[in-house]
């Protein structure tokens, strides 16, 4: 469990950070906006009201990308390992070596526990919420469950439409932009189309269950994307349904988490 006094001490970060663009940690700005917009759409009235009060009238979409910026500052550098969980090819999800500084699964579980504890004041709740809404998106980005040996695909070099890239970077943002030229609201309109029963089924399970599911996808990606691969339209077409699926899963599961916390 994280130190609650530290949560309170580090509750705020200058608004100027929100203008920065950092793609090194996660889905990229649009992916996190989509995840949080889907979650916002599925919040109960009670959860939406409480969250709005905690965030001073802002929705969770407003804070979707805040943590990527914050993790690059001295105050929040300790959260840099929270964005991912590295699992090497010879490990299983269950027996992967733990990072002493934390990982995305543990960090999500800690934010949930902190928000349910009743021990946080408004600023502490706001900080935990900002972490939680971002990390839930990270957990559904496949290369955030990548191999430790190549730093989650950061050292897995490929060609993407003729340009040198690494596997992590194309899964963070390049594929989303190549898949559809949509705004984040258009993404929500197009992929959040299931009925209540399907949405409920997607939201079932634990944080670890969801992380394991993402890890299984990352294994497929590694298998189908050897180092040096030359990727273009076929690759985008192959993986677009997975991107849509993971963004939807992240949004619906985030809504389920928040509705349970603020019931």
Residue ranges and their predicted role:
Residues 1-11:
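Bacterial N-terminal signal peptides that target proteins for export
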Residues 12-17:
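Hydrophobic helical h-region of N-terminal Sec-dependent signal peptides
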Residues 20-23:
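N-terminal signal peptide c-region/cleavage motif recognized by signal peptidases
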């Amino acid at each position: 469990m994280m130190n609650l006094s530290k949560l309170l001490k580090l509750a705020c970060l200058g608004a100027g950070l929100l203008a920065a663009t950092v793609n090194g940690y996660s889905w990229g700005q649009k992916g996190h906006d989509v995840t949080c917009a889907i979650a916002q759409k599925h919040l109960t009235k009670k959860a939406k009201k409480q969250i709005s009060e905690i965030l001073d009238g802002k929705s969770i979409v407003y804070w979707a990308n805040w943590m990527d910026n914050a993790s690059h500052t001295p105050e929040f550098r300790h959260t840099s390992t929270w964005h991912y969980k590295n699992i090497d090819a010879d490990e299983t999800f269950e027996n992967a070596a733990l990072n002493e500084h934390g990982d995305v699964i543990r960090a999500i579980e800690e934010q949930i526990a902190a928000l349910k504890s009743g021990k946080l004041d408004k600023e502490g709740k706001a900080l935990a919420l900002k972490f939680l809404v971002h990390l839930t998106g990270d957990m559904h980005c496949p290369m955030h469950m990548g191999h430790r040996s190549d730093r989650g695909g950061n050292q897995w070099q490929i060609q993407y439409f003729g340009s040198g890239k690494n596997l992590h970077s194309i899964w963070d943002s390049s594929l989303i932009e190549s898949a559809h030229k949509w705004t984040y609201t258009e993404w929500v309109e197009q992929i959040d189309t299931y009925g209540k029963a399907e949405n409920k089924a997607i939201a079932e399970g634990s944080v670890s269950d969801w992380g394991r599911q993402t890890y299984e996808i990352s294994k497929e990606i590694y298998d189908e994307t050897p180092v040096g691969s030359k990727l273009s339209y076929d690759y985008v077409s192959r993986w677009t349904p997975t991107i849509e699926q993971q963004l939807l899963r992240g949004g619906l599961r985030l809504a389920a988490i928040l509705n349970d916390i603020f019931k």
